[in-house]
Amino acid sequence: MFKKTKITILGATGSIGDSTLAVIRETNDFEVFALTAFSNVEKLAELCQEFKPKFAVVPDLSKKQKLQSLVTDVEVLVGESGLEKVSSLAEIDIVMSAIVGIAGLKPTFAAAKAGKKILLANKESLVTAGHLLIDEVVKNNAQLIPVDSEHNAIFQCIDNHDKKCLPEIDKIILTASGGPFRDKQQLHELTDVTPEQACNHPNWQMGRKISVDSSTMVNKALEVIEAYWLFSVSADKIGVLIHPQSVTHSIVRYVDGSYIAQLGVPDMKTPIANAMYYPKRGSVNVESLDFTKYQLTFREACFERFEALKIVFNNLQNKNYAANIVFNAANEELVAAFLNKKIKYLEIIEVNKKVTKELNFENPKNIEEVFEIDRKTREYVDSVLG
């Protein structure tokens, strides 16, 4: 008898959640076991009515009451304990970790400790605690499969489960669209950028925070950290190229001079389906790539123009993993301030440079220390912003 794969979707109402559910609608291979949301209770209720999960998770009691008033045939859990439960129950086969921000850390760790197949879209799990998460994955025989289009591309280009291939890798090259301001070469051209302009990504449909991160190249800087942990490579073996068409998602250069790249139209259903079905491949409805319609171009990502990259590469080269926690937490606070029109666009990176330079912590030995560094950084940023 055919048994559907049971999946928990952490962050079901976000853009990754949307694409994951789109894949599930197109196939008959998955059963939604649990859905979680932070603020959009109405959308979560609609998804519960459509997919009939056993559990739904919301952050507090007021949202629980609201959800229960909208749907009656789902068990509603609350807060961190609820997230960790639906990430680790024995019935679950796959956990899609798509919560935005450090809030995704604990449920991702819970899934790793339970030995689950984790589809990782939550950057912060690796950015802030990569050394700790990889240890848990290895120790508990879990699987960690990247969902970001760039990392999933690398995952497809190398045999990631055969560590013998890693010495054969000469360079991992992450591609970046460059965001909406990729053709503005001077920072002074960005002085009066508005949140609406920063969120207008030319290639991808994404949430507001990640759209801003793409425009500042912080998103790519965080992906450099992820690649460092996911593929066990040193910082000097990671490169970044601006690729405006977003067709070549990443490239691996081998020591014999061979290059292997993964290409596809910019549609998140492709990497998500790849991760969901791995080690097999499933059929999903995505546009075919017509090579006759594209001219693929690449150029260097200038560290002076995109200073976020410079900060992160310096942190990795010095093995200063705590500084990446500071960088990430400061960025979250500063992007929120920008979206609320409390600071100028260029201050996102300017203030982050100042904060990352002034705050010094030892590398965390456990997840509690990660949260402590994160908390202290946010408090410091708040004091700087007044």
Curated annotation (Swiss-Prot):
Pathway: Isoprenoid biosynthesis; isopentenyl diphosphate biosynthesis via DXP pathway; isopentenyl diphosphate from 1-deoxy-D-xylulose 5-phosphate: step 1/6. This is 1-deoxy-D-xylulose 5-phosphate reductoisomerase. It holds the Pfam family DXP_redisom_C. It is an enzyme of class 1 (oxidoreductase). The keyword Repeat does not apply. Keywords: Isoprene biosynthesis, Manganese, Metal-binding, NADP, Oxidoreductase. Catalyzes the NADPH-dependent rearrangement and reduction of 1-deoxy-D-xylulose-5-phosphate (DXP) to 2-C-methyl-D-erythritol 4-phosphate (MEP). Its cofactor is Mg(2+); Mn(2+). 1-deoxy-D-xylulose 5-phosphate binds at residues 123, 149-150, 177, 201, 214, 219-220, 223. GO terms for molecular function: 1-deoxy-D-xylulose-5-phosphate reductoisomerase activity; manganese ion binding; NADPH binding. Belongs to the DXR family. One of its GO terms (biological process) is isopentenyl diphosphate biosynthetic process, methylerythritol 4-phosphate pathway involved in terpenoid biosynthetic process. The keyword Oxidoreductase applies. It comes from Francisella tularensis subsp. holarctica (strain OSU18).
